[in-house]
Amino acid sequence: MQLFCETPGFDIRPNVATIGFFDGVHRGHRYLIEQVRAVAAGRGLASSVVTFPVHPREVMQADYHPKLLTTCDEKVSLLAKTGVDYCMMLDFTPEIARLSAREFMSILKERYQIQALVVGYDHRFGHNRSDGFEDYVRYGCELGM
C-alpha cells in the first residue's frame, strides 16, 4: 500500500475509493474496502481509502475529543492489511468542511484520479453533512465517476 498525505509524490493510477475516518478498521470498514477492491478489479483500476489523521468533528467542534480505538499509525497499519493500493491521508480543514459534496468529489476526481466512490448506505458528507447516497449517485453521474 502506498501512503501519501495531501498530494501524492508519485503518479497515482486511476482508482476506486471509499472515504471515512475508519477508526478501528472494524468488520464493516473491511467489508466496504472489500467492495472497493472488487469494483476496482472489475474495472482494471487501483483501490484506495481516503481518510483523515484527525476526526473531522474535532476540526469543527473544539470541545469534541473522542476516545479513539486506534492511533493514526495503527489505522494505517490496519488499512495496509486490507490489500488496498493507496491510502490518501487528507487534512480535514475548515476550508474542506465548507465545500459542497459535489465540489469535494470533483477535487477527488481531478487531484487523486478517483473514478468511483464506494460508500455505506448511511454515509454523509459535504458542508454540514448535507448530502447522502442519492446525492453521490447524482454527482457521480455528472462528474463521470
What are these regions (language model features)?
Residues 1-145:
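Nucleotidyltransferase catalytic core that binds NTPs
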